[in-house]
């Protein structure tokens, strides 16, 4: 599912809301999460999961085409850890519907 499909699904489930309002809400939530991560904060959505920022130290990588060593700078990357309820729900859906796997 992509963002536009999520917005469409939410708009269908809430016919009393305009599509543009649903889109604005989704964008506001995602922007809030993004802004918090940019500030180095952790965002926790109980039962769903937690977004955080992890530090990746500088390292020596390899150019896959030439095999040449390449210096990779340190960086901070977003990280998501699933919540217990989400993990259990996904696992249960896989068990009840094996063709998804």
From Swiss-Prot:
InterPro entries: Hist_DNA-bd, Histone-like_DNA-bd_CS, IHF-like_DNA-bd_dom_sf, IHF_beta. PROSITE patterns: HISTONE_LIKE (PS00045). The keyword Transcription regulation applies. Keywords: DNA recombination, DNA-binding, Transcription, Transcription regulation, Translation regulation. SMART domains: BHL. SUPFAM superfamilies: IHF-like DNA-binding proteins. Gene3D superfamilies: IHF-like DNA-binding proteins. GO terms for biological process: DNA recombination; regulation of DNA-templated transcription; regulation of translation. One of its GO terms (molecular function) is DNA binding. One of its GO terms (cellular component) is chromosome. Pfam families: Bac_DNA_binding (PF00216). It comes from the Bacteria. Belongs to the bacterial histone-like protein family. Heterodimer of an alpha and a beta chain. This protein is one of the two subunits of integration host factor, a specific DNA-binding protein that functions in genetic recombination as well as in transcriptional and translational control. HAMAP family: IHF_beta. This is Integration host factor subunit beta. It comes from Maricaulis maris (strain MCS10) (Caulobacter maris).
């Amino acid at each position: 599912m992509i963002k536009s499909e999520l917005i469409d699904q939410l708009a269908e489930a809430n016919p009393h809301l305009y599509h543009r309002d649903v889109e604005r809400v989704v964008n506001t939530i995602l922007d809030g999460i993004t802004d918090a991560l940019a500030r180095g904060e952790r965002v926790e959505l109980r039962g769903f999961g937690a977004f955080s920022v992890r530090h990746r130290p500088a390292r020596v990588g390899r150019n896959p085409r030439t095999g040449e060593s390449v210096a990779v700078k340190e960086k901070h990357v977003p990280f998501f850890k699933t919540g217990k309820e989400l993990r259990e729900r996904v696992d249960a859906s896989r068990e009840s519907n094996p063709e998804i796997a």
